[in-house]
Amino acid sequence: MEERLQKYLAECGVASRRKCEEIILEGKVSVNGKVVTELGTKIIPGKDKIELNGKEIVSEKKVYILLNKPVGYVTTVSDEKERQTVMELLNGVKEKVVPVGRLDMFTSGLLLLSNDGEFIYKVTHPKHETTKTYIVKTRGVPTEKDLEKLRVGVKIEDYTTSPAKVELLLKDNTNDISRIWIQIHEGRNRQVRKMCEAIGLSVIALKREGVGELTCEGVERGKWRYLTEEEVKNIMNA
């Protein structure tokens, strides 16, 4: 059955569909030995030979992994500074997976990894509004007015964050510490940290508690598990 080239590349885990479109337009993809730059191009998986930068792209089994990331690991496939990467925690995973979004080195909690470009796009693109839930421990105690700013949206650098759900879990005025529950559907670089800084708080610890309905329940820190078919469907159909 015919399939659009960019969709096939995304399904093979090359990148998100949007990024695959860019790769095609850049002339990096060939079909049966001929460079293709037209996005409407259709191919027949298993029959047509698809190459990216001269290397054949072969569809592999789609896998979806939930990792309980510890602090101290960078969210990347490889690191030029030779720091520990989350890939080192995936013992037994043979497929070539990539992180779905990013948690900085000092953030712990739920991180998804996959080789399914469509799944990655669904989770990471803001238009799909897949929720990401965090628990933040901060130096400084926010006022209700501060919390409302986070709920409405705060200006960070050159953009204003989308509305967020925010609840104060702990207020310790004596030690000047608080714990805040934050749920967003964006995923910009260090967004939650910057949101807290925007209202005068300093982040002591940050943990991602969930993505959509997924949590790290039953998964020890530094360990991982495969998502079930139902969990994948719930994400894709949300």
Give each language-model segment a name:
Residues 1-238:
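Basic, flexible Lys/Arg- and Gly-enriched helix-loop patches that mediate nucleic-acid binding at interfaces
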